[in-house]
Amino acid sequence: MALAANKLAEVEGGQVVVKDGQVIGLVELAIGGLMSTERAETVAEKTNTILKGFRTCGCNLNNPNMQLSRLALVVNPELRLSDKCLVDVTHFTFLPVIEGPAK
């Protein structure tokens, strides 16, 4: 997790897949973590490294990087996860991630 977070900080946003201490997929999205300054063809090639990385890690979901992107985009309806907390977008409130003592 630390390697992934540090890599994203280094490239100023994007998507990364890490396995066994190695970055195996990376696409830099330096504009708000959503858009790239690179040509579409280059971004498509890098996005393929993300998809291959997910498959290498055992994820067989259809287009998992887009599913994860939707989760974090806090302007979408319902609940969203931000870098700060869980957001109830419908009621414009922040929700605790952990409620009460762990059992």
Segment roles from a protein language model:
Residues M1-K103:
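Active-site microenvironment of metallo-dependent hydrolases
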